[in-house]
Amino acid sequence: MRRILTVVVMSLLLLSCADASVKEYKLQVVAEYPHDTESYTQGLFFHDGQMYESTGLHGKSTFRKVDLATGKALKKFTFDKKYFVEGSVVFGDNLYILTWDSKVAFVYDAGTLEYKSTWSYPREGWVITTDGKQLIASDGSATLFFLDENFALKKRLIVKYEDRPVRWLNELEYIDGKIWANVYTTDEIVIINPKDGRVEGVVDCRGLLPKSLYTKDTDVLNGIAFNPSDGKIYLTGKNWPKMYEIKIVEKK
């Protein structure tokens, strides 16, 4: 299981005080929904108004079509225990699902969810999203990889806060022309300019899940989904009991 010591993670809440051009945001919870506590959330997204989720861990990895109102899987398929599933996204007619350390990615039919093919993937798979024109992926470093539908590399982009690379980019979502990424093991989301990689905003997500709801299995924030149909944004975490519809409000 992928675990990274928090001491090696950049504290963007501290860094955000150094650059006045980087906007700081807090969360406003609009609504909350149940979330399956067995879901070690790796990827979360909407396609045609429907929520989908990929979940990880060897022997427990799944992909599921999720009923937002109940948190239950309307449809689910599992993977061989050798695979640790990571991020997922629909681009064109394909559903793409990454694996962490197996150096493969799976492609399914986006409409039927039927398996189509397995592709070689040249790096660790962490997360993947799309801007509607290309795939955008992270390997947990400070680099974002822009890929075509066959995973051919189109460009690399280094994400930076001021002049410092921002590592551990995890769970990407393309929202209104920007790339949102939560920074693994932190309660922070960075908002990235996809043209130059500059961090333009930091979202403070501390306290989103109340401590009273924590169990021994509750893990970190990981799950950002934007529904283009209505403009709503949702957050959750690994093995969290709740999914939250949120808005961000600039800090005064």
Segments from the language model and where they lie:
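Beta-rich, blade/repeat-based domains predominating
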Residues: 37-48, 81-92, 121-134, 138, ...
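Short loop/turn segments that connect beta-strands within beta-propeller blades
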Residues: 67-71, 109-113, 148-152, 193-197, ...
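Hydrophobic, well-structured mid-protein blocks that either form specific transmembrane helices
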Residues: 105-162
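C-terminal motif of bacterial Sec signal peptides marking the signal peptidase cleavage site
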Residues: 15-16
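A short helix->beta-strand "capping" segment at the edge of beta-propeller domains
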Residues: 20-38, 68-72
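Conserved beta-strand positions in repeat-built beta-propeller and related beta-rich domains
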Residues: 53-57, 96-102, 137-141, 181-185, ...
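Blade-loop segments of beta-propeller domains
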Residues: 71-107, 113-125
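Beta-strand-rich domains and repeat architectures in extracellular enzymes and scaffolds
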Residues: 30-62, 77-89, 237-239
